[in-house]
Amino acid sequence: MLLVAALHAIEVAMFMDEKSIASIDQAKEAALRILLHNAHGQFQGLPRTAGWGYPEPYTRDLMISALGFLATGNEELADALRRTLVALAENQTARGLIPSLAHDPDDRGASDTTPLFLFGLALYRKSANLPEFLNQAAQSALKWMQYQSPDDRVMVSQLPTSDWRDEQWVMGYGLYVNTLVYAYLKLYGEHESAGQLRELMNRLEVCGEAKNPHEHEGLVVPSKPYYALYSYKVLNSDRFDLLGNSLAILTGIASPERARDLVAWIEAECEAMRARGELAVDLPSCLFPYILPHHADWHPRYEIYNRPGDYHNGGVWPFICGFYVAACVAVGRMDLANRKLLALTELVKPWHENEAEWGFNEWIHAQTGQPSGRDWQTWSAAMYLYAVQCVQRQDTPFFGDMRPGDLNR
């Protein structure tokens, strides 16, 4: 252990000066303060989604934040996760669907809340050594998810605007939601189903009219290392989804070789975007290329909420960048992971609506680098802390056992 710690100290020193290390420490302290501030909200005492703008306990935000909650080792945050899981189980529908708000059983219709509940519950069980915690709710949720596969072959489908991107069109077999399905299948020991899903996702995406009607859609983009945004029958989008692809790396859906190529491709594409003035920061946009008004997949409503480089149409989201830092660690690119962590530390500093020393904003405008969402966002703070732990430990807690042995744990 002493040797590992010494080697880590040497590696950190190679990439970070004292000022950078101090800045990360300050950001860690601020992130923890934000999470503790948000741990008790006005809705049944459940955690807030943000310090100001979002007082509600949004399921997806809090389940994603489980990674950061548990990474801190803080008992109050672990209890906040436990209370949220209990509330979700109590408000689960009779058939197993998990609502979008932890306190409101009638806020339904999301495609990612049930797989995220299963994911967050598995993390809590492992951390607390409670393998049977909320078992009835887990079994009901697993059953619900089985019926979300249109052809009864594990891969699940979704309706547009039903996942975390409530202002973006993703339909059919979406990458992000299916990476969550793969993750919970691995965590719950459903290895046969997980293997089947991984095989399906790694098939070539079939485009055009000549598709064999008996061939299942895949998500691999021909001649590219990344996975498509979505695919369903003759419809698909080969735009790049940073969250989905980062999860594909972390979970081991991507082979070690593909994962390394994918990270290299992301960096090359982002460098080209910066050269064109499309990206102002040293972190990737959540989606690219951006959807423009003359593109076939543009929707009139995007002019209001989803302009190019904004929000779900290429905004830079700190919580997603936390996953990307972890993905860099997963492929063994510690030099890159350190650099991206420093960039993320700079990204979470500015505030937008509420003056604070550290903003931990919701999302950042890609072309200007200016914060544009809500400050003190729970998942922004939580995933920052998770990213820091990944870099400092040089592994990816909770994900390592999902990946093939030759991909860095």
What are these regions (language model features)?
Residues 15-56, 83-107, 147-172, 202-316, ...:
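Extended glycan-interaction surfaces of carbohydrate-active proteins
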Residues 59-88, 124, 244-256, 325-334, ...:
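Alpha-helical support elements that line or immediately flank enzyme active sites
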Residues 66-70, 80-83, 112-141, 384:
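Substrate-binding cleft of carbohydrate-active enzyme catalytic domains
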Residues 78-82, 135, 195, 260-263, ...:
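Conserved positions within tetratricopeptide repeat
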Residues 67-71, 119-126, 183-190, 250, ...:
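Short glycine/serine- and small hydrophobic-enriched flexible loop segments
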